[in-house]
Structure formats: C-alpha cells, structure tokens
C-alpha cells in the first residue's frame, strides 16, 4: 500500500466522519464554484475510494435535502443534487473564513450588540449564529466583535427576524491601562485556549503529510490528491469555522491558528490541480460535464499559485 493511502485511511478512521458534514465539505470545496450540481452516481464515485458506499452517500444527501441545504432534480432514473439558495448562502459565508490567507486587519473599533425583549429560545439561536460569525458574549445580552462589518451583521439580524430587538453600538479601542484586562477577557469569552488546542490537533494530524508529499510525489494520483484535499478541508473547516478570527492584536502569543492555516495552504496548493482533474473526470451534471472553476476559486488562500488558464487546461 502507498504511504499516501496509509495516511488517507488513518485520517478517515481517526475520528467518526459524518456523512452530511463530509458531503457539505465536498460541495463547498469542489463544487460550489463549478455550478454546484452533480449526479448522485458521481458523488458515490468520488467517495468510493475513501471507503464510503452509495448508502452512505444517499443517506447524507437525503438529510441535506430535508434540511433545505440541497435541491434535487430527477431526470429518468437519475438524481442530481445541487446547492439550494440556502446552501449556497451558507457555503459563501463559510468560505470567507475557511480560505482566508491571514488574520483580518483591525481599525481598533468594536461592534457591540445589545439584545432587548427576546425570549430565551430566540436569544439562544441568535447568539449561536453570532458566535459562528466571530462574536463573543461579554454578558448574557451583550455580544461583541472587533472584526465584523455592520452591514453583514444587519443582514444576519434581518434574516433572523430580530433586527428591531437588537441595539448596535460602535466602540473604540480601550485605553492602555485596560488592555491587560481586555486580553484576559477576550481569552475567556472567545474560548481561545480550547480553539488553540483544536488547531494543535489539526497540525499533529496533517503535518506528517508534508514530507510524504515529497517522498511519494510520483504516487500522487488525481484520486489520491482529491482524497487528501477533501479530508484536509473537511478537518480544517471543522476547526476554523469555530475560530472567531480575532485581529492579531488580541491573540495570545504562539497562536497555533497561524501554523495551521499555513500548513493547510501548503498542502492545498500542492494537491489542488490533480484534485480538480479527478473531480472533472468523475463529475457529471444534468447537462453533461462540470464547468471549469469560476474566478473566485483561484482567489482562495490569497491566490492559488498556478495560472488559471493552465489549470483549466490541466483538468480538461
């Protein structure tokens, strides 16, 4: 067995893999910029080499369709699954965090949200969405973020139907005498110790792959490249989507997120061309071949280090 196959199987078996989560990763990474639609049989072919059968795929697709994340259309005996409006919106929101090349710049301002008159259930749901967007809870009804744009937050509040129950404030960076207390509060409210530990686990899992990709370069087939890329993004996504992506000024020393991001970028850059080739080979839509990736694909991680024209030629 190839050393790359050994690594891939170890990654699959290390922790239980949710079908809905894995296929969400696949759609977001491999299909969202290629039309967002694929035949069920193509998905089964893409995942077969990882040990996931058609029943695994069908069950996950059924659940994602039931949740409104995927739409399904049937032509004859074939079923084609595509990202719904909801699925595409959530995918775009997630990829803005997943494929960042660096921490967000900060102008020293804070966005504060004070909720008024919300029942406990609604408040809990809104707080969950805001935390996913990078907010922290300074108090039961007070959320804060140093890096969110007001327009994005307003959209979220309107979608949740609570815009009239939330007061928005802007605050400047605190005086120097309160910065030590601020750092301690930030670490507590944003659970940075736990987040750092998750990044460390990701690094321990994927760092051994870096020398393997050099030692076994001739074994990096399109199928193996795709499997590596899917697992890489799947496990990185599970960590980075919980990261509030705080500005550099607020992070503790030796923040593992920096190393984890660069590790992900280095591996992704290495396997992306061949992975795209495999998706092109196996992927089929209701109108034939998958389209070439859109321009936004090539802006991932600050820009993939391969010319778009050359990559499109490679996958044909």
UniProtKB/Swiss-Prot annotation:
Pfam families: PaaX, PaaX_C, PaaX_M
Single GO term (MF): transcription cis-regulatory region binding
Presence of keyword Hydrolase: no
Entry-linked InterPro entries: PaaX-like_central (IPR048846), PaaX-like_N (IPR012906), PaaX_C (IPR013225), PaaX_trns_reg (IPR011965), WH-like_DNA-bd_sf (IPR036388)
Domain of life: Bacteria
Pathway(s) this gene product operates in, as recorded in its UniProt entry: Aromatic compound metabolism; phenylacetate degradation
Alphabetized UniProt keyword annotations: DNA-binding, Repressor, Transcription, Transcription regulation
GO-annotated biological processes: DNA-templated transcription; negative regulation of DNA-templated transcription initiation; phenylacetate catabolic process
Family under the similarity heading: Belongs to the PaaX family.
Function text: Negative regulator of the paaZ and paaABCDEFGHIJK catabolic operons. Binds the consensus sequence 5'-WWTRTGATTCGYGWT-3'. Binding of PaaX is specifically inhibited by phenylacetyl-coenzyme A (PA-CoA).
Name of the protein described by the UniProt record: Transcriptional repressor PaaX
